[in-house]
UniProtKB/Swiss-Prot annotation:
PANTHER family: AT-HOOK MOTIF NUCLEAR-LOCALIZED PROTEIN 8, AT-HOOK MOTIF NUCLEAR-LOCALIZED PROTEIN 9. The gene is AHL8. InterPro entries: AHL, AT_hook_DNA-bd_motif, PPC_dom. This is AT-hook motif nuclear-localized protein 8. Residues 1-175, 303-372 are annotated as: Disordered. It holds the Pfam family PCC. Residues 174-316 form the PPC domain. It comes from Arabidopsis thaliana. The keyword Repeat applies. GO terms for molecular function: minor groove of adenine-thymine-rich DNA binding. Residues 101-110 have a biased composition (Basic residues).
């Protein structure tokens, strides 16, 4: 017996039950098919990628992607992957095409390169024009009149229509003026401001409107209804806060007359404020500058009632135009209880072309102003009447 042939030992490890093993003769021999686990799944195939041209690799990837898409569609039941079922791919191809279209950024051009306007008006639809024509023809048969088509709405211009401001003045009962010109009147120390304004109005037939003034006064006579005498005289240094008024021209029986009024608000040395209508002197304590404006008022002719015309009565004389705003009550003359102011004989704001300046005693005979003249600045002081 050869020593090389060693009999198998009884102590050799036996395979566990349930496992088949081949005979231990050749360890390098191929494994028995009994050792290979059985499986119903197909083996995973790993295709080799060519290392050649890059274009070939891209083509291979595209073919593989198409195969995967076809299998996915078949598994979902959307088709067999044929070209007829390609549009049902959830819009993937449409999205890819939209991404390929380049979108222009920014606002579109208003003018084309040739210089013409790119944004033109859309032409009128022929259906709309035909409908409008048929509507006009139908209106002819129904109404029997002229069946013209409805004109397009006219574009309305922006701003106030011409002539509307004059209508507003007519509604307020006033008239407009023309040729407004500003002026500055210099009043020296010790001069009467009211007399200066009246002297300035004598230079022409224009209406005077007092706008403002700056300076101080030393003596002023004001009309105040709360006082027992009705007229109060203040002496001292008073700063002018506001000075306003007007000088009006009006005709009575063919003669031109002037009538004016003046209102002032003054600040005393102790901080108190006094004011009212000026009925006498307004003496300047320092040099005073008065800013006035002159213009030509367009007076309206009074309307004659049909009753007066039928009876042959003369119409009422025209009074001062009502468009001027009176910035204070018109002085009707000093009160009979104050004798000191009557004896002073200070000039008032009434003047006639024939008689000149009326004194304080003659003011009661002067014709009063138009009753429609307005009162302003009455709320600035509680003691002011009218």
């Amino acid at each position: 017996m050869d020593s090389r042939d060693i009999p198998p030992s009884h102590n050799q490890l036996q395979p566990p039950p349930g496992m088949l093993m081949s005979h231990y003769r050749n360890p390098n021999a191929a494994a028995s098919p009994l050792m290979v686990p059985t499986s119903t799944s197909q083996p995973i195939q790993h295709p080799r990628l060519p290392f050649g041209n890059q274009q070939q690799s891209q083509t291979f990837h595209q073919q593989q992607q198409q195969q995967m898409d076809q299998k996915t569609l078949e598994s979902l039941g959307f088709g067999d992957g044929s070209p007829s079922s390609q549009p049902m791919r959830f819009g993937i191809d449409d999205q890819n095409q939209q991404l390929q279209v380049k979108k222009k950024r920014g606002r579109p051009r208003k003018y084309t390169p040739d210089g013409s306007i790119a944004l033109g008006l859309a032409p009128t639809s022929p259906l709309l024009s035909a409908a409008s024509n048929s509507y006009g023809e139908g209106g002819v048969g129904d109404s029997g009149g002229n069946g013209n088509s409805v004109d397009p709405p006219v574009k309305r211009n922006r701003g106030r229509p011409p002539g509307s401001s004059k209508k507003q003045l007519d509604a307020l009962g006033g008239t407009s003026g023309v040729g407004f010109t500003p002026h500055v009147i210099e009043v020296n120390t010790g001069e009467d401001i009211a007399s200066k304004v009246m002297a300035f109005s004598d230079q022409g037939s224009r209406t005077i409107c007092i706008l403002s003034a700056s300076g101080a006064v030393s003596r002023v006579m004001l009309r105040q209804a709360s006082h027992s005498s009705g007229i109060v005289t203040y002496e001292g240094r008073f700063e002018i806060i506001t000075l306003s008024g007007s000088v009006l021209n009006y005709e009575v029986n063919g003669s031109t007359n002037r009538s004016g009024n003046l209102s002032v608000a003054l600040a005393g040395p102790d901080g108190g404020i006094v004011g009212g209508s000026v009925v006498g002197n307004l003496v300047a304590a320092t040099q005073v500058q008065v800013i006035v404006g002159s213009f030509v008022a367009e007076a309206k002719k009074p309307k004659q009632s049909s009753v007066n015309i039928a009876r042959g009565q003369n119409p009422e004389p025209a009074s001062a135009p009502a468009n001027m705003l009176n910035f204070g009550s018109v002085s009707q003359g000093p009160s009979s209880e104050s004798s000191e102011e009557n004896e002073s004989g200070s000039p008032a704001m009434h003047r006639d072309n024939n008689n000149g300046i009326y004194g304080a005693q003659q003011q009661q005979q002067q014709q009063p102003l138009h009753p429609h003249q307005m009162q302003m600045y009455q709320h600035l002081w509680s003691n002011h009447g009218q």
